[in-house]
């Protein structure tokens, strides 16, 4: 499977849970910015992997992977011995 764009909205405001339990990455490795996109208030990024955060539960946490972000995340999935299929099943 090959993806060039992935965007998933999680109905939670707990960014740490999404990064560490769903993506299985470490939040301290991400850079935090006090501004966001798409009317989100802040975001975290690791390379081209973006996690946008809103205090509003309706918006929740948004994961956005564009082309290079998908390739980077594939590298992490490979290191975790997971596939895209397994990742989407965990989501």
Question: Model regions: which residues?
Answer:
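Structured, helix-rich domain cores that form ligand/interaction pockets
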Residues: 1-91
């Amino acid at each position: 499977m090959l993806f060039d764009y992935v965007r998933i909205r999680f109905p939670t405001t707990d960014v740490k849970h999404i990064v560490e339990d769903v993506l299985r990455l470490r939040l301290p490795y991400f850079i935090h910015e006090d501004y966001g996109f798409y009317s989100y208030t802040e975001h975290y990024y690791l390379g081209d992997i973006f996690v946008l955060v809103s205090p509003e539960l309706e918006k929740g946490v948004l994961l956005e992977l564009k082309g290079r972000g998908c390739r980077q995340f594939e590298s992490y999935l490979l290191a975790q011995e997971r596939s895209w299929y397994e990742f989407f099943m965990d989501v």
